[in-house]
């Protein structure tokens, strides 16, 4: 469950290390984002010579949450941290590598690239 002001780790090699959610996209008064939802983020911490720099405002997709995701069979997939992958204006990932596992819920036509780059899909 990601909302405004939530700090997230970045699960790609775009150069950002920490981002903060500044808006949950999709609806005028939408409060929470779950895995697979697109949010607007501000880069709070970045490495030198990265593709993004501190203060940049980008779109991102949530790939891991502490809240987790409930599957139709009743199982719950949870993670130790909240993480996102930074996207460009065409909603494609900026980075060329994904770190850590992602869930099967990302496996739709929009985020197939993230699933294929991920080392593990749960």
UniProtKB/Swiss-Prot annotation:
One of the record's GO cellular component terms: cytosolic large ribosomal subunit
What is any one GO biological process for this UniProt entry?
A: translation
Q: List the Pfam families.
A: Ribosomal_L14
Top-level taxon in the UniProt lineage: Bacteria
Checking CDD domains in the record gives:
Ribosomal_uL14
Gene Ontology MF term list: large ribosomal subunit rRNA binding; structural constituent of ribosome
PROSITE patterns linked to this entry? RIBOSOMAL_L14 (PS00049)
| Keyword Signal carried by entry | no
Q: Which protein family is it in?
A: Belongs to the universal ribosomal protein uL14 family.
* Family annotation (NCBIfam families): rplN_bact
> How does the record describe its quaternary structure?
Part of the 50S ribosomal subunit. Forms a cluster with proteins L3 and L19. In the 70S ribosome, L14 and L19 interact and together make contacts with the 16S rRNA in bridges B5 and B8.
Descriptive protein name: Large ribosomal subunit protein uL14
Protein source organism: Pseudoalteromonas translucida (strain TAC 125)
